[in-house]
Amino acid sequence: VEFEGMNQMVVPTLIDYLFKKVLRPSIVWPAFVYNYPKTMQPLARQNDENPTIVEQFQLVVNGWEIIKAYSELVDPMIQKANFDAQAKAREMWDEEATSGDDDFVLAMEYAMPPQSGFGMWIERTFSLLTGQENLRDVVLFPLMKSVKKDEPQS
């Protein structure tokens, strides 16, 4: 697979792009995707048996990410190293890389309990349940365009 801009991407961005544009659209039936490379999720906890992957999964249905969940990384030393790696990747033109957060790392140094979380796309779930192909047809609270004061309202 080749595409424009491929040679300028750093490895995590390339993996993410290939997953989203090549693999994920081919997943029709519900599937859990897990064993993500550590470089893909700097805020997730490393797997105890294999430190090259993180404790994360996604539920993918009909090519859409419905749920994303992971165990949170709570080790401040590892998190600082991850933020440093992200900063270096950002310098190498990786637009997806996050900048470090020293306040977050400082808070972690005071101790954080083990934790995890998940995000669920309600609109995508409604689209699947109602057979809609366009997310705009099921958005619960669509953004409204601002009306300028000098424009007539209908």
Spans of model-derived segments:
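Hydrophobic, well-ordered secondary-structure elements that form the walls
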Residues: 33, 69, 121, 125
